[in-house]
Amino acid sequence: MSLKKFNLLLLLTAFLTPAYSESLSPLKNDHVYSVYSGTFDTIDKENDAKTSFYGIQHSNTNLFKETILGKFSPVTGGFLSGKNGIYLYTGVQAEYDLGPLSIVPSFTPGYYERGEGKELGSPLEFKSEIKIDLDILKNSKIGFSYSHISNNDWGNINPGINNK
């Protein structure tokens, strides 16, 4: 699938899914979809894998669990890199609200397929991420995140990648 077709599909999914689900159900929409893009392998010393990536993430507000350590919820998502690498994941995130600002750390094990991109040493990879979100409208946020993906030395090699 070409990157232009993927971007179009991603935009249509992001904009039509909430409208379609709200028209079918009078209940509150408890599903949160995040669409994101960034730079894949930002600290690429060999200059062979740095590229863009585009992804989508889902969480359900009904599954938030309040604890003394914060508000936790499961997340599921995936991204496609500009070199046809994919990462599909599911894991947990915490959310700490500071007024209109949210700090959201997460940990998500997942499946990585390199495509024409960087070899990470194993199909099983772990993503740790810190995200800062700012509420800009009633149902919209804008944010910045930084993530690291590696296999914890369980693979043949473990170069890891950093994304922002």
Q: Across the structure, where does each feature detected by a protein language model lie?
A:
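Cleavable N-terminal export/targeting peptides
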Residues: 1-28
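Short loop/turn motifs that connect adjacent beta-strands in outer-membrane beta-barrel proteins
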Residues: 20-30, 61-72, 97-103, 139
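Short glycine/proline- and aromatic-enriched beta-strand/turn motifs that initiate or cap beta-hairpins
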Residues: 20-64, 78-80, 163
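Predominantly the C-terminal beta-signal and adjacent terminal strand-loop region
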Residues: 24-29, 44, 135-164
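Transmembrane beta-strand segments that form the barrel wall of outer-membrane beta-barrel proteins
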Residues: 32-43, 69-81, 104-113, 146-150
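Solvent-exposed loop/turn segments connecting transmembrane beta-strands
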Residues: 42-52, 78-89, 117-123, 154-161
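Hydrophobic, lipid-facing positions within transmembrane beta-strands of outer-membrane proteins
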Residues: 52-56, 72, 86-92, 126-130, ...
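Residues on the lipid-exposed face of transmembrane beta-strands in outer-membrane beta-barrel proteins
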Residues: 54-60, 90-96, 107-109, 130-136
